[in-house]
Regions:
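A structural signal for alpha-helix termini and helix-coil/disorder junctions
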Residues: 28-29, 35, 74-78, 115, ...
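An amphipathic alpha-helix signature
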Residues: 65, 69-73
Length: 152
């Protein structure tokens, strides 16, 4: 949980149950932390081209302001009864007062999510671990097999 002051008023940002129950927000964060945002439009996800990586990076960076706006709102939901419109106005004031951009705000929010256990509570960490394990199992070394020699 992070305590912030906006326009002279104190607020608490907390990424707990309210945040973890927002499907849209969990989806946004999964796309970013898993790296899926980088490759989701690639023709061949196993072998992305440099163009695919550039386009994926552009998409990911351009999603950050929306993620921040949604994240600020869901972070406030647990302890502060504000509407999404009010949360957006508070976020803008907070950014102006602290002279930060969206990239810095995203890092602050993500750090708060980690400290609050959002990634574990939402299932993102468990899913990423399962995906990594599945990836390891698919890539079984083949050097234990005998090489075939073709003699005709």
């Amino acid at each position: 949980m992070k305590e912030i002051t906006v326009n002279g008023n104190d607020y608490k940002l907390e990424f707990s149950f309210e945040a973890a129950e927002r499907k849209d927000f969990v989806s946004m964060m999964f796309r970013i932390v898993s790296g899926a945002a980088l490759l989701e439009d690639a023709v061949d996800m196993e072998n992305p081209t440099p163009k695919d990586m550039i386009n994926g990076t552009i998409n990911m960076v351009s999603d950050i302001p929306h993620i921040c706006r949604t994240g600020f709102f869901v972070g406030l939901m647990e302890n502060n009864p504000v509407s999404e419109t009010e949360a957006k106005a508070l976020m803008k004031s907070y950014m102006k007062e602290n002279k930060i951009g969206y990239a810095d705000l995203y890092e602050d929010l993500r750090k708060c999510m980690e400290e609050d256990g959002f990634f574990e509570l939402s299932g993102i960490t468990k899913t990423l671990n399962q995906l990594a394990e599945n990836q390891k199992q698919r890539k079984v070394p083949q050097d234990h097999k005998q090489k075939s020699t073709g003699t005709k």
